[in-house]
Structures are given as structure tokens and as C-alpha cells.
């Protein structure tokens, strides 16, 4: 059966336009009835009324690594519950493990590019920070294994003089964006949120964590991590989730509307340099629902 995603997504985008209009918002409010309430055991999400200040210059190099394919990706469901932090639920599939390991050469390529730049002086130290969700932590661990996978990669690391910290440092600030009443539902329900994000980065429809709230915690997390490596010039890998990393890359780059983040989607196991200018962003793609398994 052909997926209805490409057909329904434009409809939801049109509906999103109505969501921000007082004359049509009542129609979307009725959609809420189809979803269960927020789990009372889940912590409440901060309501943020505005986007944070621009991210100031940082002392270290940053790289963004999305987790490999997870069992939740294969099930085709949204997995964002805070109770997943520290658990083994929704970890990597065999393909996800492979994607995590295969991210290592690309990461080394980015680090090598930064070593050749005239900007921040490098310490050649590499650190991995990760969301506490299993799929992210396991991806960081697999990337580390990938850096030791064969003689060719090991030789590159030695020639570059990299000193890789083998410990994966967990940080709650890198957790998945919380999707409130949509948590555990099918991927297509992203269509109730992403289009509205483009109009209003502060919205909390369905009790989701807003783009502004994610940007605010990412800003705090980056500044905190940067302060822990005050000497500067370190190479820091942030292993996290699609929405969080997409928001991070456009916020860090200084794009005018961070709510457009979903048009710069990360693939499973994809690593990117965290650029600080808009011209470092990849080409934007039309808003589409994610496919099952991604």
C-alpha cells in the first residue's frame, strides 16, 4: 500500500496555517481528542515565550551526530518519554550499530578539516557527549569503536595526533525533544507539530516541547559544556536526536527562523560540523514526514 504521507503532509501544512489564525484554530483543537493525555509521571516541559539570545562564540569545535536506526524507528513511532533516559528501551538495531560505526571516518574528516583551519588552536583532544537515551548513547559508543575498527582509521588518528577520550559523557540537555501527547504515536503525527513550528517556535500544541524551549536548553547545554573545556580547541561530539540536532544546527548558524529546522533533516548515523553561519547549512528540502526505519 502506498504511503499517504506525501498526500497528507501538505494538508497538515495548510491546517497549520489555520492553527495560528483565531478564525480556524478551533478545527485543530478538535484533533486533540484523538490522543491520550500526557503521562503524569513525565516531568512538565518548560514553557518558553521567546527564542533565546543568539549563541555567543564558543571556544571549542563541535560536531553533531544523530543516533543510528533504533527499534522505535523500525516500529515507526515517536519515542521521546523522559523515562527512557538511562533505560535500554528503543536502542539500536543491527543496522543502527553499523551506522554508528560507519560515522567514524566522516567525523575524522571534519576534525581534520578543523585542524587545517587557522581559527581555534586545537588541543587534538576528542570528547563524546550524548543524550542519555539508549539509541544515542549506543551510537556514541559505536562511533568510538569505529575509530578503532581497522588499521587504516587507527593510522589516520595517530597521524593527526588525536587523543580520544573513551568515555561517553551523558548530558540531559541533549535528550530528545519531548512530544507530549504525541509520544508513542505514529510518525505521521509529526505533521501536527512541524508545520506549526515554522509559524510559531513557541507553540506547545499537544503539550510538545517548543522549538524555543529546545533552543534554550541547547544554548545552556553548549555554554555549560564549553565552560568545562575552558582551555578551548577541543573537538566535542554531541550525539543526540533529529529534532534536537536540527534545531541546534540552525540556531547555532544564526538562521532567522529556527522553526524551519525540519527542512534540514539529519539521516541516521549522520555527522555534521556545527557551523556558525547560515552558509554552512545544507540545502533545505521540502517538509516531508520521516519514513519508517529512519
Predicted regions and their residues:
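Short, active-site-adjacent cap segments at secondary-structure transitions
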Residues: 71, 135-137, 176-177, 244-246
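Short, well-ordered beta-to-alpha junction loops that form the rim of enzyme active sites
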Residues: 68, 130-134, 173, 218, ...
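N-terminal chloroplast transit peptides
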Residues: 1-27
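Acidic, low-complexity terminal tails and accessory targeting/binding regions
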Residues: 18, 28-62, 75-80, 149-188, ...
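Active-site-proximal alpha-helix that buttresses catalytic centers in soluble enzyme cores
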Residues: 44-160, 209-212
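A short, acidic, amphipathic alpha-helical segment used as a generic capping/interface helix at domain edges
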Residues: 218-230
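Short glycine/proline- and acidic residue-enriched helix-loop micro-motifs
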Residues: 192-213
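Generic structural signal for individual residues within well-ordered alpha-helical segments
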Residues: 98, 191, 212-215, 246
